[in-house]
From Swiss-Prot:
Keywords: Isoprene biosynthesis, Nucleotidyltransferase, Transferase. NCBIfam families: ispD. The lineage of its organism: Bacteria, Pseudomonadati, Pseudomonadota, Gammaproteobacteria, Moraxellales. This is 2-C-methyl-D-erythritol 4-phosphate cytidylyltransferase. The record marks 164, 220 as: Positions MEP for the nucleophilic attack. Signal peptide: none annotated. Its EC number is 2.7.7.60. The gene is ispD. The keyword Glycosyltransferase does not apply. Pathway: Isoprenoid biosynthesis; isopentenyl diphosphate biosynthesis via DXP pathway; isopentenyl diphosphate from 1-deoxy-D-xylulose 5-phosphate: step 2/6. GO terms for biological process: isopentenyl diphosphate biosynthetic process, methylerythritol 4-phosphate pathway. It comes from Acinetobacter baumannii (strain SDF).
Amino acid sequence: MRHLHHQTSQTKLWAVIPAAGSGSRFSKTELKQYQYIQDATVIEHTVKRLSQLPLTGYVLAIGKQDTFASTLSFQDKHKAHFCNGGVERVHSVLNALNYLSQIADEDDWVLVHDAARPCVTFECLNTLVKNAIETNQSAILAIPVRDTLKQVNQEQQIEKTVSRELLWQAQTPQIAKIGILKKAIETALKNNLTITDEASALESIGESVQVVMGRSDNIKITYPDDLELARLILQSQN
């Protein structure tokens, strides 16, 4: 185990990895989390990164017909749990939280991380968890928006330039206490709110969420070209 902040090593930490999505932008037939980078699948790389933290366990929310995930060589496989995913990412996360609530305390912390985000660094993970625990507040990794943003109309014509001064691009992991996050997602779904990440659910019930500086190389594999980029990033980080 690499050097951890004291609070991190003393806290019960869990992880949830929603991995039931079809990833239609990547391929109509192939799942991006099961593509190979070197000798391991994307999701194995992702779990390996998260396992640098002293996790009590992690839950993979997978498709109902998925028989492949359980055959993979996950890091600390004795800590792996599996549950059925849902129609959307938010439903997969909620299913995993419902699973966790049977084996964990509602005041335990949970990191929710994209299955197709295998390049997150230990330093970012450690800082995220430390900040959340020290402030007793939910947190996400994020980076300030760098590029100029344009708002366009339906004809793809620019209407105005959007100020990026206070805009951050959300990443994962996103960390919260299990009970609070579960309540936030349940409430948001009940109110038919559009939930794109955990922070948006937490915001909807008035929870404060802090941003912790991430890194631009914490990419999410979305398109086939991203696989090669992820391979190069992992190679350079190692």
